[in-house]
């Protein structure tokens, strides 16, 4: 028990910090939609993961079939944009392989984060789109999706 307390006291802040919402990330990276291609790739990847997780949870919900029909298409478009950005940013195949592997790891990470948060929202609030999820969902729909067209 003492070891756990000592570890918690000395744990770096980044281990205890919650992830930034997309809105917060965008505020810290103001050129995300112009010259900052890595940020745009990261943001579109997170939007893709979020919409994929929403789609999975809405899949069997009869009342939410309209959302279910839209979410997978949006997820695919966000993933495609993220992939296209990192592919065009690389100068060789080796770079693309590294970026693809890194992207897969980010997808796994964010899928777990978003799925847990979506389930917590359902259990605690009776709805999926709430709190930080609502913030990210709105950012993806209002700020990110329009620049992909």
Predicted regions and their residues:
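Compact alpha-helical subdomains of small soluble proteins
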Residues: 75-149
């Amino acid at each position: 028990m003492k070891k756990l307390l000592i570890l918690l006291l000395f744990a770096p802040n980044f281990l205890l910090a919650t992830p930034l919402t997309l809105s917060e990330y965008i505020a810290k990276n103001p050129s995300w939609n112009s010259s900052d291609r890595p940020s745009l790739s990261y943001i579109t990847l997170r939007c893709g993961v979020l919409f994929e997780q929403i789609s999975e949870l809405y899949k069997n919900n009869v009342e939410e079939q309209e959302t279910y029909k839209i979410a997978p298409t949006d997820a695919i478009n966000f993933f495609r944009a993220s992939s296209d950005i990192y592919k065009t940013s690389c100068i060789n195949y080796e770079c693309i392989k590294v970026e693809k592997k890194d992207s897969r790891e980010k997808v796994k990470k964010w899928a777990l984060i978003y799925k847990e948060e979506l389930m917590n929202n359902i259990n605690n609030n009776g709805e999926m789109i709430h709190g930080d999820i609502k913030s990210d969902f709105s950012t993806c729909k209002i700020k990110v999706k329009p620049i992909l067209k």
